[in-house]
C-alpha cells in the first residue's frame, strides 16, 4: 500500500481519490496475500517461522470472501479512475495472482519470480496512485518508481533467501533455489541501489533518516538499515505534502 500512496501524493488527491486508493490498494494486498498463502500452504507447513492461516485451519471461504471484495474494488476503480490507473491496477492484480496460482505460478520460475514482484509489488502500485490523481510524468516520478522497483526486488530476494530450503522441497524453482550466488549478488545490489537512490533523490530526508537507520542496522542487521532508510527517505517528502508544507 505504501508504494501506491507515494504515487498518489505525486499530485493533489481529492478525498474521493484518497478513499478509493486506500480501499483498492488494501483489497489488492488482501488478494495477493490470500492467494499466496492458499497456494503456499503445503510448503509453509514445513516452515516453523511461517504464520500461514491456511495451515492453521482457515478454510477456502476466506479466499472466496477476499475475491468478492476484490471484484467490488475493481468495479469501483473501473467506474471512478482514469484509464491508465485502471490498467495499472488490473495488471498489478493479475500479476499478483499469476505469481502464486497455477497454471502460471511465476514464483516457481527462476527470474520471473523476481521480475513479476518488481512490477506488481513496486512499480505498478506507484503508477496506479500517480495516474489516479493525474500526476504529470516527471524525472522525479521516474526515479521514485525505479527506486521502488529496486526495493521491491530487495524485499523479494530477501524472502526467497529465507524460504529457499522449503521452496526446494515444494518444487518451486525460485531464483535463489536455481542460482543462489547470482541471487545473493542481486540482493546486495538491489539493497545498495535502493539506499543510494533514495539518498540522492531526497538528500535532506535521508540525512534525517540516517541516525535511526544506522542504529537499526547495528541492532537488527544491514537489511533493516535498508528498510528504514528507504522508507523514511521517500516517505518524509510525501508526509510534508500531506501536511500542506509544499
Predicted region positions:
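Intramembrane alpha-helical segments
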Residues: 54-136, 217-222
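Extended hydrophobic alpha-helices typical of membrane-associated regions
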Residues: 103, 115, 199-246
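Membrane-embedded alpha-helical segments that form the functional core of polytopic membrane enzymes
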Residues: 2-39, 85-98, 137-158
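Solvent-exposed interhelical
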Residues: 24-78, 149-195
Amino acid at each position: 500500500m505504501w508504494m501506491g500512496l507515494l504515487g498518489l501524493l505525486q499530485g493533489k488527491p481529492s478525498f474521493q481519490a484518497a478513499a478509493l486508493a486506500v480501499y483498492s490498494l488494501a483489497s489488492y494486498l488482501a488478494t495477493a496475500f490470500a492467494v499466496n498463502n492458499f497456494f503456499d500452504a503445503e510448503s509453509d507447513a514445513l516452515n516453523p517461522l511461517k504464520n500461514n492461516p491456511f495451515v492453521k485451519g482457515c478454510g477456502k471461504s476466506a479466499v472466496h470472501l477476499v475475491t468478492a471484495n476484490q471484484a467490488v474494488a475493481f468495479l469501483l476503480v473501473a467506474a471512478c479512475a482514469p484509464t491508465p490507473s485502471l490498467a495499472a491496477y488490473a495488471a498489478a492484480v493479475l500479476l499478483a495472482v499469476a505469481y502464486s496460482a497455477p497454471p502460471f505460478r511465476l514464483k516457481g520460475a527462476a527470474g520471473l519470480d523476481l521480475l513479476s514482484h518488481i512490477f506488481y509489488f513496486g512499480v505498478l502500485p506507484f503508477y496506479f496512485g500517480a495516474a489516479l490523481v493525474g500526476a504529470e510524468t516527471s524525472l522525479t516520478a521516474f526515479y521514485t518508481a525505479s527506486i521502488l522497483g529496486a526495493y521491491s526486488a530487495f524485499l523479494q530476494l530477501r524472502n526467497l533467501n529465507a524460504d529457499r530450503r522449503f521452496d526446494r522441497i515444494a518444487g518451486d524453482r525460485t531464483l535463489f533455489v536455481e542460482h543462489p550466488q547470482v541471487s545473493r549478488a542481486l540482493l546486495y545490489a538491489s539493497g545498495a541501489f535502493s539506499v543510494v537512490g533514495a539518498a540522492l533523490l531526497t538528500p535532506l530526508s535521508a540525512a534525517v533518516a540516517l541516525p535511526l537507520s544506522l542504529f537499526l542496522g547495528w541492532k537488527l542487521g544491514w537489511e533493516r538499515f535498508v528498510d528504514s532508510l528507504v522508507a523514511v527517505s521517500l516517505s518524509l517528502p510525501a508526509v510534508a505534502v500531506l501536511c500542506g508544507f509544499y
